């Protein structure tokens, strides 16, 4: 670490990663993790004790994608860059297919670091693929290694087995055996594991043989509270809104209204990737089996970004097809909206505020939820929530008091919770106010970044190489790579 502060390298390999206008929901790999690493990078780069933050991801020169993903280096902010390294060719591929190409990514990253002549103080891997990459680089350069799992293989395997999926099918489709093996290795060598919740430490990492070896630090992510401001700000006569915000709101209302016979009803809102674990079908079933709920409120499901369902990946295609079939089964025409796309930068904050202004509710019925960032976003705008009782939402509801936890497999419980909030002015007002106030108290990126910087400085002060010449790789492979590259 120089006198100017920390140089932090983060790694997040899968999905579509760029600094602005994130394509969240475009596919199963471009979700909350992508948003997390971008927001974290921005927040860390603003810290006084941080000199530079680089986020490493894959270089993608694919005609099906924006040219943004083919920029070798993208400057997001003065002290924050996205660095794209080519591995496994130039085409986009889902994360399960990346494993054979990770060593290529490591080798090319070593070359990049040596060409830059600037050794990182910290390497931080997000998800097991990037965790493996960061672990190898930590060994090579003798620097501390931080890991954030975002989701874990053993927990996923347990859920898939419960759903009836055969183990050999899991291995073929998800490379689950390789993922768990790498996760066990990461737990042996990580200097620090950053998690979002205490439940993650206790229940998810507790499933691993090496789960007690690392140091853990619970650092919940934050949200941009200026972007997700309360819904009533727009109702005030002195409110000054940008043309971009006004356009986003008008476009969303126009899109929603074309689906609804009675558009002025309260709005039940769901926003997620088209993934089976998100349990969209469970929410539609809860709504479809409750005629009184249909009379009270409309349902809008924003399930990622889609064009032609038949051309999508199998998991996404199955989820969206099931969604359409459920809509038809329960005859929800005129009551349910299923828009094909939405803009996360401008439209999503407006979407929460539209639902809040209609005194609606946001629902996250996921079967498994490592954290639940959308719950924070909704709560911050004053939109009450109904959330799965699995994982991160437990901490969020405990800290914020902005809604009700439910068993995501119980459609009756989901319907009851929605009904309780929408039908009671007292409940709605209580949950709305709690969310607005408590998100701002407990969940900001500034708090996260300050605590992160303190942990990073502690790790660095414990001893590391300070320049390229002083590097002492942790193993023979590292010594060879430093010499050859």
Which residue stretches match the model-derived regions?
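Catalytic cores of nucleotide-sugar-dependent glycosyltransferases that transfer UDP/GDP/TDP-activated
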Residues: 1-485
């Amino acid at each position: 670490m120089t006198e100017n502060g920390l140089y932090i390298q983060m790694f997040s390999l899968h999905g579509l990663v760029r600094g602005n206008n994130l394509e969240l929901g475009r596919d199963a790999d471009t979700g909350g993790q992508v948003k997390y690493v971008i927001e974290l990078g921005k927040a860390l780069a603003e810290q006084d004790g941080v000199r530079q933050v680089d986020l490493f991801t894959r270089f993608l020169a694919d005609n099906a994608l924006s040219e943004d993903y083919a920029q070798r280096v993208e400057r997001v902010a003065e002290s924050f860059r996205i660095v794209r390294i080519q591995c496994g060719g130039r085409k986009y591929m889902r994360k399960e297919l990346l494993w054979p190409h990770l060593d290529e990514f490591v080798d090319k990253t070593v070359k990049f670091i040596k060409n830059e002549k600037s050794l990182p103080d910290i390497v931080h891997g997000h998800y097991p693929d990037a965790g493996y990459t960061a672990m190898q680089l930590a060994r090579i350069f003798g620097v501390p290694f931080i890991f954030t799992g975002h989701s874990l293989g053993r927990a996923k395997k347990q859920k898939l087995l419960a759903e009836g999926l055969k183990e050999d099918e899991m291995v073929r489709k998800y490379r689950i055996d390789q993922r768990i093996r790498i996760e066990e290795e990461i737990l042996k060598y990580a200097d620090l594991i950053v998690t979002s919740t205490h439940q993650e430490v206790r229940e998810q990492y507790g499933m691993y043989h090496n789960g007690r070896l690392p140091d853990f630090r619970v650092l919940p992510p934050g949200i941009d509270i200026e972007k997700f401001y309360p819904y009533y700000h727009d109702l005030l006569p002195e409110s000054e809104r940008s043309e971009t915000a006004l356009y986003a709101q008008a476009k969303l209302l126009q899109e929603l209204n074309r689906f609804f016979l009675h558009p002025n009803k309260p709005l039940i809102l769901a926003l997620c990737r088209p993934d089976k674990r998100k349990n969209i079908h469970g929410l539609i079933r809860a709504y479809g089996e409750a005629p009184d709920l249909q009379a009270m409120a409309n349902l809008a499901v924003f399930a990622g970004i889609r064009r032609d369902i038949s051309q999508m990946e199998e998991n996404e295609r199955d989820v969206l097809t099931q969604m359409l079939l459920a809509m038809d089964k329960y005859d929800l025409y005129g009551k349910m909206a299923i828009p094909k796309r939405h803009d996360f930068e401008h439209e999503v904050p407006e979407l929460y505020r539209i639902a809040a202004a209609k005194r609606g509710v946001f629902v996250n019925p996921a079967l498994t939820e490592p954290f639940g960032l959308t719950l924070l976003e909704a709560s911050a705008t004053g939109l009450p929530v109904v959330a799965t009782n699995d994982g991160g939402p437990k901490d969020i509801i405990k800290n914020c008091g902005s809604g009700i936890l439910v068993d995501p497999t119980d459609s009756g419980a989901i319907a009851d919770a929605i009904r309780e909030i929408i039908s009671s002015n007292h409940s709605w007002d209580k949950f709305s106010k709690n969310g607005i106030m408590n998100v701002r108290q407990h969940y900001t990126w500034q708090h996260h970044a300050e605590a992160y910087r303190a942990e990073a400085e502690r790790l660095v002060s414990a001893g590391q190489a300070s320049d390229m010449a002083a590097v002492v790789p942790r193993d023979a492979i590292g010594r060879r790579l430093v010499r050859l590259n």
